[in-house]
Amino acid sequence: MKDIESKRRRKLLLLGGALAAQACLPMRVTRALTLPPLPPLPPLPPLPPLPPVPPVPILPPLLDLLKRFTASIVPVPNNPYFVPQGGPVAVPPPAGAPFSGTGLPGSASQSSTLVLYDTTGPWGWLGEIYATMAGNLASHFGAWVAMPVVSYTAGTLQQYSACIYIGSTYGEPLPAAFLTDVYAATTNVIWIYDNIWQLTASQPQFAARYGFMPWVFDTSPVATVTYKSQSVRRYSANAAGIMSYSSIGAPATVLAECVRADSTTFPWAVRSGNFTYIGEIPFAYMTEGDRYLILCDLLFDALAPTTATQHRALVRLEDLHPLSDPTALLQAAEWLFSNGIPFGFHITARYLDPNGYYNDGVPQDVPLHTQPLMIAAIRTMQLLGGVMMHHGYTHQYSNIANPYTAVTGDDCEFYRITASNGVLTYVGPLPEDTDSSWAQGRFDSYAAELSASTFTMPQISTFPAYSASVPDYQAAAQTFAARAERTLYFPGVLTNQTIDYTRPAGQYVPYSVQDAYGSKVLPDTLGGIDPDVFFNIPPRLPADIIADAQRTLVVRDGVASFFYNPEDPLSYLQQTVQGLLDLGYQFVSPLDV
């Protein structure tokens, strides 16, 4: 592998300017080794604590720049994990039949949730996306059913422990039976955003009964929402508007408040009895430490109110492959072990540089079984309590840029993504990816390479770059016990229509769920430590991770999950782990979440 430092410089230049390039941190150059196989390792004695590793100095001007860059939410063009992608449609698809989602096995409450969503108009496809996300969250507590609100029939609501209605289409024609049942319900109801005025108009005693009256949308810039005495973030350029109120008083309770730029406030979420109203859609412009976490916590009130508060944390070592530096991996693993921190680690089984991008134009193909030192490092990490995770067979695709270099670790393996002028475009499935057999073939090749390296198939998978097609996700559900990642969802999944890959949307979850693809999904709430820009994700330093972990405390049974690449200074890992411990988080194994 050639000139890896320039690889990092290439990423930094996406920040914009030569100043950023000065911050390149040294990285170890590794080569394919041809040594005889090592004998099995004996059990290791407990390791003494490692001395603290001093931080690697970074130019102060650049460090200040990075802090400013991450002090507020940075919009990422064409990033489906920030906001659903795609414009209006000329003809909305048919509403579709109800979708039944499986609850997370072993969930404490085994409640049932009815998710109702909008479908009409050119933006009707958003309703299905938001319903998918709401259903995923509800699966933490039990089974769920999603259906278009226009298909609602009288009495349906009372068959469930709770109902979530997501008003994403202004003026959706809500059935009178739905409005009547909501007003008469003893079931917990969470109403999100639009069309609340249809309920108030249908029930003249609404204000007297509930103690509040929605008024107009307030479009003031709001960057902060307060909840449980904690401030969480909101993308202030989101000008869709948040509902304000003409009156509010007993018996209503303000659960969360928006903070305008002039420090004045107004309600973000209100509850009265069994009825909770949220004045905007939390799934749009979602990021780490976001007001989306408030909804995630409010679901406990509706579905599992006796849940005890606990705050757990996960850490995983990211993007390990046959040419990773074994010394750096073991340094991180030994420090975690010596401090009693369980961890996971990603393994990509085969390193490919098909065009010699980092090797003077000479192609490289390095399978794991040819690297005895890396094999020994992996076995040692397992002895130290590390949990291996699948992270792609090659973590790249063919010999084309997808989207960058065609090299393992840089590119996507299960989805076509292009890059132009620093903007990523999520194109869709790869040409061969027509059904689940293609992804299953990649999984089988991965398992064969691990077997040749004396390892068994991991129980947990993370798709490279958090990107895959619907058949790929479905294949993963049949192959792995869980996925640990953020996930792409598409119109057509709930409605059993043709999948619309032009409108992807991403979601992270703060607790384990059983998602719409049928997989258990582990939390990935904080992203990773990375002083660079890569895949158009802004730099994130330990202070950023810790700040968002503090915001994540608003979820009473939430998990703070982050990843660390051993190519970066060990001090980054140490600072972040200690910061989460100081906040009261307890680190657990990925197998125990």
Residue ranges and their predicted role:
Residues 1-11, 17-25, 29-31:
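N-terminal secretory signal peptides
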Residues 73-159, 309, 336-339, 345:
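Aromatic-Pro/Gly-enriched surface loop or interdomain linker
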Residues 89, 96, 266-312:
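Non-catalytic propeptide/linker segments at domain boundaries
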Residues 165, 169-236:
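A glycine-rich, often tryptophan-bearing local segment used as a flexible ligand/cofactor-contacting loop or short
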Residues 220-274, 280:
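Catalytic beta-strand/loop cores that center a nucleophilic Ser/Cys/Thr
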Residues 304-305, 312-322, 326, 437-460, ...:
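Catalytic grooves of carbohydrate-active enzymes
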